[in-house]
Design a protein with these regions (language model features):
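Helix-boundary and loop/linker segments of multi-pass membrane transporters
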Residues: 9-14
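Short, strongly hydrophobic transmembrane alpha-helices
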Residues: 16-41, 45-46
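Hydrophobic secondary-structure segments that place a key small or acidic residue at a functional site
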Residues: 106-116, 126-194
Length: 194
């Protein structure tokens, strides 16, 4: 009797134990495969969202919080800095380009970002409908924002302070949706740009 025949004979003696072992091995292997795929997808998304960004400058506070809020828009901002302080960096001879961001308000959990067209260009943002904001209280929204909130061109809404939905609503100032971005699989899909 060779080793293969001996192994098969042993497996056939306890079919329930064999089936449970095969099931557990399959579940373990599947779990590891799912974790590896999820890690790869998350890593690719983080790299894609940080493309072409070398430095994040912001208010005093936690560097991690600054990166999470200013780059990935996944945390509460450390605060805004004065434009005069930002200009020091923006006009520095070693800085090729600088993009200002103003954070703090949201709509239904999606961050409202005050910035300029350069921010959209970093992510190769293309409009599916409408135009980029050019006037006060005009806003262009990401594809995920449009789907989740039901906002469309011409819709108006009031932003609210903070990200958690419990902040003060700015009912006195309503934004008007003037553009909707195409899906880009970047952070731009989850933002409202004004």
């Amino acid at each position: 009797m060779n080793l293969l025949q001996l192994s098969l004979s042993n497996l056939s003696l306890s079919p329930l134990s064999t089936a449970v072992n095969i099931l557990l091995l399959s579940l373990g292997t599947g779990s590891i495969a799912i974790l590896l795929i999820a890690t790869h997808l998350l890593s690719a998304a983080l790299i894609r969202d940080a493309a072409d960004i070398d430095l994040v400058v912001g208010a005093k506070g936690s560097p991690l919080q600054l990166v999470l809020s200013g780059l990935y828009h996944a945390d509460i901002p450390t605060g805004n800095i004065r434009l005069s302080e930002a200009r020091t960096w923006m006009e520095h001879p070693m800085v090729e380009s600088a993009i200002p961001l103003s954070l703090g308000d949201s709509h239904k959990g999606f961050r409202i970002v005050g910035t300029n067209e350069d921010y959209v260009d970093i992510y190769d943002g293309q409009l599916a409908e409408g135009k980029l904001p050019s006037n006060l209280l005009e806003i262009a929204i990401g594809s995920s924002v449009s789907k989740a909130t039901g906002l469309s061109l011409g819709a108006t809404f009031a932003g609210q302070h903070g990200l958690d939905g419990a902040g003060h609503a700015h009912d006195e100032d309503s934004y008007t949706v003037v553009g909707i971005f195409e899906a880009s699989d970047t952070v731009l899909d989850r933002l409202l740009i004004t």
